[in-house]
């Protein structure tokens, strides 16, 4: 039985590119970088910026990541998906709304938490429909984890992975 050979001039198409630009410099990137990602290029950039400045930085970072992609594959990605992740914090509704509108106008997706990314961690355990402050997040996470919550824990993704479906439903 002979094998069919693929012609040498047919190349596999370039994969997709996903860029996640976060407000947090460590907590969010530590979590997102643990996602099991195959057959796509995946980049997570923690900026320390928020709202409009984060969206502006995302524009810069997307161009940088596309340039890196082109160097690696010799062509543009099939699709570039951009996520901007930030906290609502105490920003005015106008600033917050402007950031979301600017991101959407660029075709970026937005994920935000009411006060801190740790709310996402809490949703792995319970549904919350009441206001919680940052200090409450830490106390509740410490209770659920049965150990002191450490903000920039490199293993938080692995710790929470078995509860990820619950978090998605609770979100």
Label for each model-derived stretch:
Residues 47-58:
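Phosphate/oxyanion-binding active-site loops and adjacent basic polyanion-contact surfaces
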Residues 3-19, 29-45, 67-83, 88-171:
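C-terminal accessory helical subdomains adjacent to catalytic cores in phosphodiester-
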Residues 25-27:
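Short acidic, Gly/Ser-rich segments with clustered Asp/Glu that frequently serve as metal-coordination loops
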